[in-house]
Amino acid sequence: MINQENNDLYDLNEALKVENLTLNDYEEICKRLKRKPNRTELGMFGVMWSEHCCYRNSKPLLSKFPTEGKHVLVGPGENAGVIDVGNNQKLVFKIESHNHPSAIEPFQGAATGVGGILRDIFTMGARPIAVLNSLRFGNLDKSSNVDLLRGVVSGIAHYGNCVGVPTVGGEIDFDDSYSGNPLVNVMALGLLETEEIVCSGAKNVGSPVLYVGNTTGRDGVGGASFASSELTTTSLDDRPAVQVGDPFIEKSLIEACLDAFKTGDVIAAQDMGAAGLTCSSAEMAANGKLGISIDLDLVPSREDDMSSYQYLLSESQERMLFVVKEEKINDLIEKFSKWGLYASVVGEVIGTNEVIISHKGKIVAKIPTSALSDDTPVNFHNVINNPPDDLLKKWEWKENDLPEIHEKNIFSLKENKNFSFSEIILKLLSNPSIASKRWIYKQYDSQVQSNTVFTPGKSDAAVIRLREQNKKNKSKVFSGVAASVDCNSRWVALDPFRGSIAAVAESARNVSCVGAEPVAITNNLNFSSPENEIGYWQLSSSCNGIAEACKALETPVTGGNVSLYNESKNKDNLITPINPTPVIGMVGKLDNVEKAISSEWKNIEDQIWLIGSHKSETKIAASSYLEYFHGEITGRPPKIDLLDEKFCQSFLRNAILKSLVVSSHDISDGGLAIALAESCILSERGATIELEKDLNRVDNLLFAEGGSRIIFTISKMKQNEWFNYLQLNQIKFPSSVYVKKIGYVSSDTLKIKIDEKNICNIRVEELTEKFNNSISDYF
């Protein structure tokens, strides 16, 4: 008999609103249970049937992704993906979002986002070795956005620094669409330390279920449902739905869990993240095709008089649920106690496929595991056949809509005056989306663990040194991994399909630019409401683009996160959706980390080369230049030829491994001119560049984006070897791929000539001042 705890008298309409469920959902719940749910059970269904937990709106689209590959050991379905990076080493990685919590409580929202993704990693038996983040905020001319940025960065820094995991890289972008709804996506990587991957499926009927970690409180109750709804002017009232983290307990939890896993006494493990004890128990039961019974009276709590609803939906941080060997339970409890952690047997594995919850001596919930985890509802939406009319109109934009170029100047449609190309370069460098993120990453400890090869900002991707390998020559050789998070949300907003292909291609290109082979991705799909036909079309088109790019580049998807309903409602009830933002977290492997290279020029007189594709379009449409200089967000983003993209990356990687290429940098936001300026700034050296205009406008040549392009340098000492390599590989080149010398590294000035005419002459000091101070000036 199910105890209704006197809450069978609840107001149904009010309860459904709180749990973000529909009347149809309620009728389906009654059908599954063959009775009416009590209030506790309704809360359990509310969180488990939310988009955050069951992907009810996105599941049909996620099935399009390739999930298998030669390096993939664990794909979607577990706490994180796992790949083989060679030398008997396994990399665990995943990305997650904490968007809505960060919007109303930026410090704790971001901090617990870091804590949550770290638990996904070490729950698999891996030691966390790196964190990256992808952040989006509204423009910094609004003080509220400055406050959000300050709070989020402080939260990430606090948790990551205290727990001892380096924050090694990331990206950040600013756009008005994020003003009411910032995005905080965190990616973590870990190196497996156990002989076997620790999985989440419960096994062996009668095995004890062990609760480990922090105590349970009322913080975070309903967090999963909160994360699956839009933000409104009353969202600040939902602050109790934001969790409060303790990185020092997390540090103890990491060490204690890895120690316990190595004993082989832990049969299964699941962290308590979204939906807390409800989700962890249901997923462990479902993944093991068994059931679990939990007695809430045995759960360590920090507050008195908590209801079963609060116990089950609390998202208090730093908590884990284990299935363990019965004969080893005392040893494990003693081990966790030594780390200052609570450890208590709270239940057992049962033979029936149910989650059974007891409280105060009575059963308060009894639900089939399939109803909570395996067989959750799916919302099917119609996909509109054609892009929206406003996008089609933007796609008609042509470069000849811009003012003509007179000598060395062009008229800005945004500021109604002429600018020289040197002034435009400086202006673009001061755009916060392009400018140095030094103010942000200097708050992070990027060097803890002593395996970070390049500090943030020095290279296109983060590079982490792995364990030493024993080679026959007895010299120390370290393998490594590279990671990058990328998305040009402006491109995705203007064409979700092309923009998402570009996000995958750029993340792979960044990994290739350090010399690593891209092998797999995790993604974080940040979109607005799927109930809006344009919002769902954006999501569907984006998934199609990601799937196509991942198949072509052979980088399967190992898992990730979907965050929908990212839109804000103002006091007039007007809804502002975010730019669709499918963040791609790419990982790559290096056999020898000493071969990795950065983006900075190395030596004066090194040759500067450019590789790219004629099939991959290069144009001003959808560019940063068009937005920031002319005030227009329009045009169709460049199309990327994925075969040429793959060839360009492979060709460059091979040259890097042969130690022919000494620096490389992909061309993205701001085009060729900004890529050149960035390498000058990083190295405190100049560059002398000579280009041919052909039929291009000068601004197209300097600021166009796309083209699968990379600039790289060849040491003046290796030029003969380079030309030999180039000649040997020429026969393999597709006719649409080009490699050409465009200049050389010089002392202290960026000089650009086009058709032998001086277009730009800027001292590196001036470039650096604009680049470094743009964001910090707001603080």
From Swiss-Prot:
InterPro entries: PRibForGlyAmidine_synth_PurL (IPR010074), PurL_linker (IPR041609), PurM-like_C_dom (IPR010918), PurM-like_C_sf (IPR036676), PurM-like_N (IPR016188), PurM-like_N_sf (IPR036921). Signal peptide: none annotated. Mg(2+) 2 binds at residues 120, 271. The active site is at residues 52, 98. Mg(2+) 1 binds at residues 96, 561. It holds the Pfam family AIRS. ATP binds at residues 55, 94, 523, 560. Keywords: ATP-binding, Cytoplasm, Ligase, Magnesium, Metal-binding, Nucleotide-binding, Purine biosynthesis. It is found in: Cytoplasm. One of its GO terms (biological process) is 'de novo' IMP biosynthetic process. Pathway: Purine metabolism; IMP biosynthesis via de novo pathway; 5-amino-1-(5-phospho-D-ribosyl)imidazole from N(2)-formyl-N(1)-(5-phospho-D-ribosyl)glycinamide: step 1/2. GO terms for cellular component: cytoplasm. Substrate binds at residues 97-100, 119, 243, 315-317, 563. Its main location: cytoplasm. Monomer. Part of the FGAM synthase complex composed of 1 PurL, 1 PurQ and 2 PurS subunits. Belongs to the FGAMS family. This is Phosphoribosylformylglycinamidine synthase subunit PurL. It comes from Prochlorococcus marinus (strain MIT 9215).
